[in-house]
Protein backbone atom coordinates (compact mmCIF):
# COMPACT_ATOMS: atom_id res chain seq x y z
CA UNK A 1 0.00 0.00 0.00
CA UNK A 2 1.20 3.50 -0.79
CA UNK A 3 1.78 6.39 1.52
CA UNK A 4 -1.03 8.56 0.20
CA UNK A 5 -4.60 9.39 1.13
CA UNK A 6 -5.90 5.89 1.87
CA UNK A 7 -3.44 5.07 4.71
CA UNK A 8 -3.96 8.51 6.27
CA UNK A 9 -7.65 7.70 6.73
CA UNK A 10 -6.76 5.01 9.26
CA UNK A 11 -5.25 7.55 11.64
CA UNK A 12 -8.60 8.60 13.15
CA UNK A 13 -9.30 5.39 15.08
CA UNK A 14 -7.01 5.58 18.10
CA UNK A 15 -5.34 8.67 19.56
CA UNK A 16 -1.62 9.10 18.95
CA UNK A 17 -1.07 10.85 22.28
CA UNK A 18 -2.80 10.29 25.62
CA UNK A 19 -2.40 12.04 28.98
CA UNK A 20 0.96 11.39 30.65
CA UNK A 21 0.99 9.92 34.15
CA UNK A 22 4.01 11.96 35.24
CA UNK A 23 3.57 15.45 33.78
CA UNK A 24 -0.16 15.38 33.02
CA UNK A 25 0.21 16.76 29.50
CA UNK A 26 -1.39 15.08 26.49
CA UNK A 27 1.98 14.07 25.07
CA UNK A 28 2.38 10.35 25.84
CA UNK A 29 2.78 8.52 22.52
CA UNK A 30 0.86 5.24 22.68
CA UNK A 31 2.83 3.46 19.94
CA UNK A 32 6.30 4.58 21.03
CA UNK A 33 5.50 4.27 24.74
CA UNK A 34 7.05 7.49 25.99
CA UNK A 35 6.06 11.07 26.70
CA UNK A 36 7.22 13.74 24.26
CA UNK A 37 7.08 16.43 26.97
CA UNK A 38 8.79 14.91 30.02
CA UNK A 39 10.38 11.70 28.68
CA UNK A 40 8.38 9.31 30.89
CA UNK A 41 8.77 5.75 29.63
CA UNK A 42 12.11 6.53 28.02
CA UNK A 43 14.13 7.53 31.08
CA UNK A 44 13.74 8.06 34.80
CA UNK A 45 14.98 11.64 34.56
CA UNK A 46 12.81 14.52 33.42
CA UNK A 47 13.35 15.57 29.83
CA UNK A 48 15.01 18.99 29.85
CA UNK A 49 17.12 20.93 27.39
CA UNK A 50 18.90 24.26 27.65
CA UNK A 51 17.14 25.59 24.55
CA UNK A 52 13.76 25.35 26.30
CA UNK A 53 14.53 27.87 29.07
CA UNK A 54 12.43 30.68 27.57
CA UNK A 55 9.35 28.46 27.36
CA UNK A 56 9.76 27.21 30.92
CA UNK A 57 10.27 30.74 32.24
CA UNK A 58 7.04 31.89 30.57
CA UNK A 59 5.04 29.06 32.16
CA UNK A 60 6.78 29.35 35.58
CA UNK A 61 8.11 25.79 35.44
CA UNK A 62 11.31 24.80 37.19
CA UNK A 63 13.59 21.86 36.67
Curated annotation (Swiss-Prot):
GO terms for cellular component: cytosolic large ribosomal subunit. Gene3D superfamilies: 2.20.25.30. PROSITE patterns: RIBOSOMAL_L37E (PS01077). Zn(2+) binds at residues 20, 23, 35, 38. InterPro entries: Ribosomal_eL37, Ribosomal_eL37/eL43, Ribosomal_eL37_CS, Ribosomal_zn-bd. GO terms for molecular function: RNA binding; rRNA binding; structural constituent of ribosome; zinc ion binding. It holds the Pfam family Ribosomal_L37e. Keywords: Metal-binding, Ribonucleoprotein, Ribosomal protein, RNA-binding, rRNA-binding, Zinc, Zinc-finger. It comes from the Archaea. A zinc finger (C4-type) spans 20-38. Its cofactor is Zn(2+). Binds 1 zinc ion per subunit. GO terms for biological process: translation. HAMAP family: Ribosomal_eL37. Part of the 50S ribosomal subunit. Binds to the 23S rRNA. Belongs to the eukaryotic ribosomal protein eL37 family. This is Large ribosomal subunit protein eL37. It comes from Thermococcus kodakarensis (strain ATCC BAA-918 / JCM 12380 / KOD1) (Pyrococcus kodakaraensis (strain KOD1)). The gene is rpl37e.
Amino acid sequence: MGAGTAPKGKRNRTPTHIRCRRCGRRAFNVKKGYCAACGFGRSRRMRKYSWSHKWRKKRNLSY
